[in-house]
């Protein structure tokens, strides 16, 4: 999936749309929306009608002024449900808001980005990267919430294959079930911390996953939740 990067393009998905036009069988598209826009619900509806679109996104980690009760947040969630597309939530530092959004919108498929945990862009890796894990685990109580296991390797304080990530990840797998866990590398953010190959191989070489668990985590759950797979 190709998520239009907020850090580079804010709410403009032009580049992601250009990439999709060149490689229409390779990518599904997700873009962030500004809850402060008066017509944001209509924006989501129009976005959902574009070929290749599979989701929307709310950037609570960077737009923390928006509460769960904000009209724009509600509009995005309602529009996502009406269009049948998931809404991704980047919510590190705002897990309480994510909990309330999930409670208020049980009919909207919600995806927690980046494990719900703040992750580094460059070394050194901070200690205590999984300190807020219990708050993340609490989100599993909502059936409409799934979680992306993106960037997990960037929270490791060990070298490849990052042996210290598996204890916290196993808690997530138990809480959510593999059918609600979506693997990803987040490599474009993590280029200063690991290679793309390392981000993939860490999940392929581990004996912490069965064949069936690995297949669900590394594609099966994503295809089911987003209704998309590469052409």
Model region roles, listed by residue range:
Residues 1-11, 202:
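An N-terminally biased module of ancient metal coordination in phosphate/nucleic-acid-related enzymes
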Residues 7-93, 100-103, 148-152:
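Active-site gating/metal-coordination segments in enzymes
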Residues 171, 176-182, 191-231:
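Mid-to-C-terminal alpha-helical segments outside catalytic/metal-binding sites
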Residues 14, 42-43, 122-125, 194-196, ...:
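Short aromatic-enriched loop/helix-cap "lid" or pocket-rim segments at secondary-structure transitions
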Residues 54, 67-182, 230:
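Catalytic pocket-lining loop regions of alpha/beta-barrel enzymes
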Residues 9-13, 65-66, 119-121, 155-156, ...:
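Short catalytic/ligand-binding loop motif for oxyanion handling, primarily in non-cytosolic enzymes
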Residues 16, 47, 56, 80, ...:
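Conserved, mostly hydrophobic/aromatic
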Residues 13-30, 165-174, 199-206:
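Short, electropositive alpha-helical surface patch
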């Amino acid at each position: 999936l190709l998520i239009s990067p907020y850090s580079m393009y804010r709410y403009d998905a032009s580049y992601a749309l250009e990439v999709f036009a060149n490689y229409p069988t390779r990518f599904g598209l997700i873009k962030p929306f500004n809850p402060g826009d008066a017509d944001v619900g209509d924006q989501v509806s129009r976005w959902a009608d574009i070929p290749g679109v599979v989701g929307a996104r709310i950037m609570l980690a960077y737009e923390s002024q928006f509460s769960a009760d904000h009209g724009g947040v509600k509009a995005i969630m309602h529009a996502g449900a009406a269009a049948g597309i998931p809404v991704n939530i980047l919510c590190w530092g705002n897990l309480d808001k994510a909990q309330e959004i999930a409670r208020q919108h049980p009919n909207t498929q919600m995806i927690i980005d980046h494990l719900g945990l703040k992750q580094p862009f460059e070394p050194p890796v901070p200690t205590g990267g999984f300190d807020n894990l219990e708050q993340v685990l609490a989100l599993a109580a909502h059936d409409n919430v799934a979680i992306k296991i993106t960037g997990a390797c960037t929270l490791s304080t060990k070298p490849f294959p990052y042996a210290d990530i598996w204890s916290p990840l196993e808690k997530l797998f138990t809480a959510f079930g593999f059918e609600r866990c979506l693997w990803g590398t987040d490599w474009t953010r993590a280029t200063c911390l690991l290679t793309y190959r390392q981000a993939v191989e860490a999940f392929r070489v581990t004996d912490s996953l069965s064949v069936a668990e690995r297949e669900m985590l590394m594609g099966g759950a994503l295809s089911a939740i987003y209704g998309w797979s590469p052409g």
